[in-house]
UniProtKB/Swiss-Prot annotation:
It comes from the Bacteria. This is 1-(5-phosphoribosyl)-5-[(5-phosphoribosylamino)methylideneamino] imidazole-4-carboxamide isomerase. It is an enzyme of class 5 (isomerase). It comes from Anaeromyxobacter dehalogenans (strain 2CP-C). One of its GO terms (biological process) is L-tryptophan biosynthetic process.
Length: 238
C-alpha cells in the first residue's frame, strides 16, 4: 500500500485547511520544492499536490510551484485542483505531472473525463470529496446531491482506474481516517481507492492497509509532527 504525502498550495505556499475552510488556513512552508525534496528524502515515491487556488478559480493557478515540485528528483507528482479542460490537463502533464486528479470535472464534465482517459491512458484519476455522504465540488464549496459510490461508478465507466476519496468533515481534524467507508466504496464501485482526510496516527495507516486500500494520503499529521513519513512508509509495507 502506498503512503502519499500531500502538498496543498495557496499563493505558491504550502498550506493546510481545516475541514476545507479557506478562512482556516495554516502556512507550513514558503518553498514547495524544498518541502517536496524533504518528503522524497523521507521515502515518498508519489506526492499528492492540490492547487487550492485553482480549485476555486476553475483553472490551474499555482503552475510555477507545480513546475518546481516536478523538478525535484525522486518522486512522481499527482495534481488536482482546477483541471476542468483538456488543454489545462495537457499543460500540467507537460510540466512533469505524472497523474491528474479530476474532481469537479468528474461530476460536471464526464465527457472531459472520457476524453482525458482516452488521450492520456493510465494518467487520469478521480478525486471524490464527500461531507455527510454528499459529494462536494469546486474546492468543497458546492454540494451535488450525489453519493460517492454513484460518482465512482460513473468515472470508472469513463475509464478511471483509481479514485481518491476524502471525507471532508474529517480533513485536518485528526479524527481518524474513514478506512471502512473507503473500503465500501472500493467494493461497491469496483475501483481502486486511496483514502484521505483525518489521518492522525500510524493506526490509520494500518487500518487502510488492513482494509485492502490502494493507498492513504497524509497531510496535516505530517506537518504537525504527529506522524513521521518514514515510519508511515515502513508501516504500510509491514
Amino acid at each position: 500500500m502506498l503512503v502519499i504525502p500531500a502538498i496543498d498550495l495557496i499563493g505558491g505556499e504550502v498550506v493546510r485547511l481545516e475541514k476545507g475552510d479557506f478562512a482556516k488556513k495554516t502556512v507550513y512552508a514558503r518553498d514547495p520544492a524544498e518541502k517536496a525534496a524533504e518528503l522524497v528524502r523521507d521515502g515518498a515515491t508519489l506526492i499528492h499536490v492540490v492547487d487550492l487556488d485553482g480549485a476555486k478559480a476553475g483553472w490551474p493557478v499555482n503552475l510555477d510551484a507545480v513546475r518546481a515540485i516536478c523538478a525535484v528528483p525522486g518522486a512522481e507528482v499527482e495534481l488536482g485542483g482546477g483541471l476542468r479542460s483538456l488543454p489545462d490537463i495537457e499543460k500540467v502533464l507537460e510540466l512533469g505531472v505524472r497523474y491528474v486528479v479530476l474532481g469537479t470535472a468528474a461530476v460536471e464534465r464526464l465527457d472531459l473525463v472520457r476524453q482525458a482517459c482516452a488521450r492520456f491512458p493510465g494518467r487520469v484519476r478521480s478525486g471524490i470529496d464527500a461531507r455527510n455522504g454528499e459529494v462536494k465540488i469546486a474546492g468543497w464549496l458546492e454540494g451535488t446531491g450525489l453519493g460517492a459510490a454513484e460518482v465512482a461508478r460513473r468515472v470508472k465507466e469513463a475509464g478511471v482506474g483509481l479514485v481518491e476519496y476524502t471525507d471532508v468533515g474529517r480533513d485536518g481534524m485528526f479524527t481518524g481516517v474513514d478506512a471502512d467507508g473507503a473500503a465500501r466504496l472500493q467494493a461497491e464501485a469496483g475501483v481502486q481507492v486511496v483514502a484521505s482526510g483525518g489521518v492522525a496516527s500510524l493506526d490509520d495507516v494500518r487500518a487502510c492497509r488492513a482494509a485492502g486500500l490502494a493507498g492513504v494520503i497524509v497531510g496535516k499529521a505530517l506537518y504537525e509532527g504527529r506522524i513521521a513519513l518514514a515510519d508511515a512508509v515502513r508501516t504500510a509495507a509491514e
